[in-house]
Regions:
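Ordered, amphipathic secondary-structure segments that act as subunit-interaction surfaces
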Residues: 83-114
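Conserved mixed alpha/beta catalytic, RNA-binding, or beta-rich assembly cores of soluble enzyme
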Residues: 40-81, 168, 173-176, 181-191
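N-terminal basic/disordered segments at the start of proteins
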Residues: 26-41, 151, 161
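Metallocofactor- and cofactor-centric catalytic cores in central/energy metabolism, strongly enriched
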Residues: 22-23, 62
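Glycine-rich, aromatic-bearing surface loops/beta-hairpins
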Residues: 103-192
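Bacterial N-terminal signal peptides that target proteins for export
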Residues: 1-8
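Bacterial N-terminal signal peptides
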Residues: 9-16
Length: 192
């Protein structure tokens, strides 16, 4: 009976240790789901490399992810693709294209993995400083989610600007043109 009790205690300890590790590994993913559900138009998600500066402004939520940028990007895009509320406009740093593998070993592999993790989404390139300025401006009025990864390669952060999922730029442009035409027609009505 004593041996059975030891086996039972050891089994329970191993099971709880295994479950604790599973919870620990999934914590960042749960946080991403929770925060992403609260974000909408004009909010931002940054999938950041390890040295990305900590943000202290209200409205910035930070999540530590024990993965590399491509894995976090893949996960975030899968979460966003499950909603019709928002779609990401994806910005990458212009500098990333020019960083050489000789100076940052692993950058070529990271770029390949990032391309795969993009799920076919188009990207826009901007200088990192311009992206940080856009992020700072957005954070004055809107929330930002920063997912800090373990990637230790320069200029590898990805910036997702959230747009309405059910309304695109073409629809907005057509609406504005129609409103402008209606306004112009009201201004040129004949005098009775």
């Amino acid at each position: 009976m004593n041996g059975f009790r030891r086996i039972l205690v050891c089994g329970a300890a191993l099971l709880s240790f295994g479950c604790a590790n599973m919870r620990k590994e999934n914590t960042w993913q749960g946080a991403v789901i929770q925060h992403a559900r609260q974000l909408g138009y004009r909010n931002w998600i940054v999938i950041a490399e390890a040295s990305f500066p900590a943000q202290s402004r209200p409205g910035v939520r930070q999540v530590m992810a024990p993965v590399e940028v491509p894995e976090a990007l893949d996960y975030v895009l899968r979460v966003l693709e499950q909603t019709e509320d928002v779609r990401p406009q994806i910005h990458v740093t212009r500098e990333l294209r020019s960083v050489e593998n000789d100076f940052a070993p692993g950058i070529d592999d990271l770029r390949k993995r990032m391309k795969s993790a993009l799920h076919g989404h188009d990207t826009t390139e901007l200088d990192q400083q311009s992206l940080l300025t856009l992020l700072e401006d957005a954070n004055r009025s809107y929330d930002v989610l920063v997912i800090r990864t373990q990637s230790a390669l320069p200029y590898s952060s990805i910036f997702l600007e959230l747009k309405p999922g059910y309304w695109d730029e073409l629809s907005e442009s057509r609406l504005r043109e129609r409103i402008d035409r209606e306004r112009a027609q009201k201004l040129v009505r004949p005098f009775p």
